[in-house]
Amino acid sequence: MTTKNAIIMAAGKGTRMKSKLVKVLHQVCGKSMVDHVLTQVEATHMANIVTIVGHGAKDVEAALGDRTEYAVQTEQLGTGHAVLQAESLLKDADGMTLIVSGDTPLFKAETFEELFEYHQAKGAAGTILTSKAPNPQGYGRVVRNRLGIVEKIVEQKDATKEEQEIHEINTGVYCFDNQKLFAALHEVTNDNAQGEYYLTDVIQIMKNQGDVVAAYQMDDFDESMGVNTRAALAQATKVMQQRINAQHMENGVSIINPDDTYIDAGVKIGADTIIEPGVLIKGHTTIGEDCFIGAHSEIHDMVIEDRVRVTASFLEDSIMHADSNIGPYSHLRPQAEIGEHVHLGNFVEVKKAKIGNRTKVGHLTYVGDATLGQDINVGCGVVFVNYDGVNKHHTNVGDSAFIGSNSNIIAPVEVADHSFIAAGSTITDDVNFHDMAIARARQTNKPDFWGRLPHEPENM
């Protein structure tokens, strides 16, 4: 089997993005553009992967880690100069070398494999991946002769009027014989309008040496989309989102309105789950089978087991076990764990708390820094008061306890199994097994107090 290598171009500053963030680290559906590219390159089982870094090199290296080797382009002298920086790492490598830009997040591994196969079938020294662009403005044009053989690639600024009318464009992806690539790069000059060392000049050098140069035209132009502006980033995100949603639907997920549903690339969703419009599912979220995610819910880095129902709520970095439900208008903050068959109603906030099976927290409640057992009823308006102004404190509530409405639980306290807290209580001490705690002022009625009012209210 022929050895395969890859070079990912990620050294550019991306000035048109007008951003402090390195261009290739801008995200498309939850992953940086260069991460998308690297993931697809990895899927083609490369022997060597080298990423060319320059602007923001440390940030790119931190983002990609040890999944790739790195070569640094200290001066931005063109694409040919950039590739040449990988020579020290690949000079002894045989076989084929793929070159792809780190700002093209929509390429698929299958396309790279097709390019490799075509390159080998043609016995080529270099093969260009091309596409037909509806609007080729800004792209390098692929110039062919009457027999359809590639003559050259000409950049937009160097193209004649006739050449600018060509719609077949260079996608910026190439497959080269590795040894011939670096030999040709040493012959590239910067005698052009930009004063740069163009990688595309390698094509003409190879042709002049009598080597075969081929061009493989891909069908899907969107896949070759490069991102240089915020508008292009939005367009790439739209295409990627359509692709992600289509894959989930193919796997048995019902997405009511795919055009109004945002799902990150790392999300996993089980079959027969229904997702309503306006939903955002982000990060490394996993959703089980037969779930319902209601309209306008936002979910980040969650584990949601089977048959969970989420209604118009915000969930982040927590776990919901099977057959539980939440919402509308509730919030799971980080490190919450919700047991099976739990009911969390409207306007409930849970933070760094564990709630046991079959417990019900109906509405207007804050549960923070607490462990609640099984079969507990938490009434309306209950607050777990966890902060003393300096430190957070923990509360434990045992199985089958009952907490009446409008109660304040002042941590740290222990509320035992089968205990009862009367409505309106402020609990500052432990509540023992089978006890009822009442911590409120006794009601006093004042007879005939109405007549003592300074004046009689109108309409009474």
UniProtKB/Swiss-Prot annotation:
Keywords: Acyltransferase, Cell shape, Cell wall biogenesis/degradation, Cytoplasm, Magnesium, Metal-binding, Multifunctional enzyme, Nucleotidyltransferase, Peptidoglycan synthesis, Repeat, Transferase. The keyword Protease does not apply. The active site is at 363 (proton acceptor). The keyword Nucleotidyltransferase applies. Residues 252-460 are annotated as: N-acetyltransferase. Mg(2+) binds at residues 103, 228. GO terms for biological process: cell morphogenesis; cell wall organization; lipid A biosynthetic process; peptidoglycan biosynthetic process; regulation of cell shape; UDP-N-acetylglucosamine biosynthetic process. In the N-terminal section; belongs to the N-acetylglucosamine-1-phosphate uridyltransferase family. This is Bifunctional protein GlmU.
